[in-house]
């Protein structure tokens, strides 16, 4: 999708305020919903994904399972709200050995598990709105000893509210971000920054 796009800085793949936030996303929902609502805390439109079973309620990008994103930027960032329910997301990448690997982070897992084609890890979230930062290059190297080449697919499961999902060439401070990438929290004033925990355990 983005193979022929010049990639630097910030590359947004979902923005809840946009005219068609799910234009490049496929929606799979059973016993749940994906809808745009106004979040009372930030008084702004957000995308809510809710479902009784997280495995049957998710959005994925790109829409066509045969196509890939082709995003080379190494930082994956999501601005999401903790709904105090099970929540997970998955990023599929390809490394310099031409092997596809999946990284799945969830708030209901306690240990990191690395298998040849999938790495699952726990993720802690604060109350309210969180900024989840995922250094794909670092995780690929630590889990598999290979180098990150590009991201192929993203899947975001219930249960959460999403403000924005984007890729970046590096981590940006709040002051460096363009205004439309910032989330203004009237109550706390500061967005909680999280990263999936990569703590290896021997099993």
Curated annotation (Swiss-Prot):
It is found in: Nucleus; Cytoplasm, Cytoskeleton, Microtubule organizing center, Centrosome, Centriole; Cytoplasm, Cytoskeleton, Cilium basal body; Cytoplasm, Cytoskeleton, Cilium axoneme. GO terms for biological process: cilium assembly; positive regulation of cell motility; positive regulation of feeding behavior; regulation of cilium beat frequency involved in ciliary motility. The keyword Cell inner membrane does not apply. The keyword Nucleus applies. Keywords: Cell projection, Cilium, Cytoplasm, Cytoskeleton, Microtubule, Nucleus. GO terms for cellular component: axonemal microtubule; centriole; ciliary basal body; cilium; motile cilium; nucleus. Belongs to the CFAP20 family. PANTHER family: ORF PROTEIN. Cilium- and flagellum-specific protein that plays a role in axonemal structure organization and motility. Microtubule inner protein (MIP) part of the dynein-decorated doublet microtubules (DMTs) in cilia axoneme, which is required for motile cilia beating. Involved in the regulation of the size and morphology of cilia. Required for axonemal microtubules polyglutamylation. This is Cilia- and flagella-associated protein 20. It comes from Caenorhabditis briggsae. The lineage of its organism: Eukaryota, Metazoa, Ecdysozoa, Nematoda, Chromadorea.
